[in-house]
C-alpha cells in the first residue's frame, strides 16, 4: 500500500503543492499590480493615487476584491447564460496555466518540458477564445464588436511574435525555456545585438496581444463603452480583469526569458552570481511591467487602421526579413547551433 502511495499518489500531491505555490503568489502579484498601476499613473499625473484604504493605500486591492465579490452578478436576458459564465473563467485559467513552463530560477520550474515554447504559443493563441465567447454570449453589439476587434488584433500580432521567436530558436537551438536561458550565458555579444531589434518588436507585439495601451482597441471606452466585457459585473468582470493583468506578467516573463537572460545576472561579473537567480528574474519582470504602466500613462491610443498597418505592413515583413538575415549570418559564421 505504501509503495502505491509513493509511486502514484505522492507525485500528484507534490505537483498540486507546486501549482498552489505558483498560483497564490501570482494572484497576489496581479492584485497589487493594479495598485502599482494606479500609483504610477497618479504620480505621472501629479496626483496621489489610492492612499486611503490602509497605510499608503496598500489595502486597496483587497477592498476592490471584496467589493466585486459581494456585487450581484447580472446576466443579460437574451444572452447565452452558460457561455456567458464560462468566458471569464476560460480567460483567467488560460492566463494561469501558461506559467507551468516558465523557469523562475535554475531548476525552479513546474514542468521543464522540451517543447516549452510551443506550449506557450498554444496557450497564447487559445486566450482569444474566452474573449470571442464573451462578446458573442453577451448579445450586445458593443461587446461583439470588441470581441471581433480583439480576435483580429491578436491573430495579426501572433504572426510577428512567432517569427520573432523563430529568430530566438535559431540562435539558441532549443525549444526548452531553461535551455534558452542557459544558452544566453555563453552567447556571443554580436548575436545579442542582432536579437535586440526583435526584442523591441516582440515587446510591442505583446502590448497588442494583451490589449494594452496604445493598442487597447477591443475595450476602447470612447467607442465601445468597455468592449467585450461591457455586460459583465461582479466576479465575471473581476476574472477578466485578473486575466488581463496575469497575461501582462506572463508576457513580461516570456520577454525576460527570450531576450533578457531570464534568471541570469545582467552582466558577466563573478560576484553577481552570489545573488539568487530568482531575484534577477523578478527584477527584470518588474522592469518590463513598469514599462507597461509607463506606456499606458504617456501614449495615446492608435486608430484601428494604424494598428493593422503596423502589424501586417511593418512588423510582419521586418520579422520575416530578420529570420532570413539571422539564419544567413549564423550559417556564414558557422554559429548555427546543433539540435
Curated annotation (Swiss-Prot):
Annotated catalysed reactions: a quinone + NADH + 5 H(+)(in) = a quinol + NAD(+) + 4 H(+)(out)
UniProt-listed Pfam families: NADHdh
InterPro entries: NADH_UbQ_OxRdtase_su1/FPO (IPR001694), NADH_UbQ_OxRdtase_su1_CS (IPR018086)
Record-level GO cellular component terms: plasma membrane
Disulfide cysteine pairs (residue numbers): none
Entry keyword set: Cell inner membrane, Cell membrane, Membrane, NAD, Quinone, Translocase, Transmembrane, Transmembrane helix, Ubiquinone
GO BP term (any one): aerobic respiration
Molecular functions (GO terms): NADH dehydrogenase activity; oxidoreductase activity, acting on NAD(P)H, quinone or similar compound as acceptor; quinone binding
Topological type in the membrane: Multi-pass membrane protein
Main enzyme class: translocase
Entry-linked HAMAP family: NDH1_NuoH
Function: NDH-1 shuttles electrons from NADH, via FMN and iron-sulfur (Fe-S) centers, to quinones in the respiratory chain. The immediate electron acceptor for the enzyme in this species is believed to be ubiquinone. Couples the redox reaction to proton translocation (for every two electrons transferred, four hydrogen ions are translocated across the cytoplasmic membrane), and thus conserves the redox energy in a proton gradient. This subunit may bind ubiquinone.
Full protein name: NADH-quinone oxidoreductase subunit H
Amino acid at each position: 500500500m505504501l509503495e502505491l502511495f509513493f509511486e502514484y499518489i505522492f507525485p500528484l500531491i507534490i505537483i498540486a503543492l507546486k501549482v498552489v505555490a505558483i498560483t497564490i503568489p501570482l494572484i497576489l502579484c496581479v492584485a497589487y499590480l493594479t495598485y502599482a498601476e494606479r500609483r504610477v499613473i497618479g504620480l505621472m499625473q501629479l496626483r496621489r493615487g489610492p492612499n486611503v484604504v490602509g497605510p499608503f493605500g496598500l489595502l486597496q486591492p483587497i477592498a476592490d476584491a471584496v467589493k466585486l465579490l459581494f456585487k450581484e452578478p447580472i446576466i443579460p436576458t437574451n444572452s447565452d447564460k452558460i457561455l456567458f459564465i464560462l468566458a471569464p473563467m476560460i480567460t483567467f485559467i488560460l492566463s494561469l496555466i501558461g506559467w507551468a513552463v516558465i523557469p523562475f530560477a535554475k531548476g525552479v520550474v513546474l514542468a521543464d518540458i522540451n517543447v516549452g515554447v510551443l506550449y506557450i504559443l498554444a496557450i497564447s493563441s487559445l486566450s482569444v477564445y474566452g474573449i470571442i465567447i464573451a462578446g458573442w454570449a453577451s448579445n450586445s453589439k458593443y461587446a461583439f464588436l470588441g470581441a471581433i476587434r480583439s480576435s483580429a488584433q491578436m491573430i495579426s500580432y501572433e504572426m510577428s511574435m512567432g517569427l520573432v521567436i523563430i529568430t530566438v530558436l535559431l540562435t539558441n537551438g532549443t525549444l526548452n525555456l531553461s535551455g534558452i536561458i542557459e544558452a544566453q550565458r555563453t552567447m556571443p555579444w554580436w548575436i545579442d545585438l542582432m536579437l535586440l531589434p526583435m526584442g523591441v518588436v516582440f515587446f510591442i507585439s505583446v502590448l497588442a496581444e494583451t490589449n494594452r495601451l496604445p493598442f487597447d482597441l477591443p475595450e476602447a471606452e470612447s467607442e465601445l463603452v468597455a468592449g467585450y466585457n461591457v455586460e459583465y459585473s461582479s466576479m465575471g468582470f473581476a476574472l477578466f480583469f485578473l486575466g488581463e493583468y496575469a497575461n501582462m506578467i506572463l508576457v513580461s516573463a516570456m520577454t525576460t526569458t527570450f531576450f533578457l537572460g531570464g534568471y541570469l545576472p545582467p552582466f558577466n561579473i563573478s560576484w553577481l552570481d552570489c545573488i539568487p537567480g530568482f531575484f534577477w528574474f523578478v527584477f527584470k519582470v518588474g522592469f518590463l511591467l513598469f514599462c507597461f504602466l509607463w506606456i499606458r500613462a504617456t501614449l495615446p491610443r492608435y486608430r484601428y487602421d494604424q494598428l493593422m498597418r503596423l502589424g501586417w505592413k511593418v512588423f510582419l515583413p521586418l520579422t520575416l526579413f530578420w529570420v532570413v538575415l539571422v539564419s544567413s549570418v549564423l550559417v556564414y559564421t558557422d554559429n548555427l547551433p546543433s539540435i
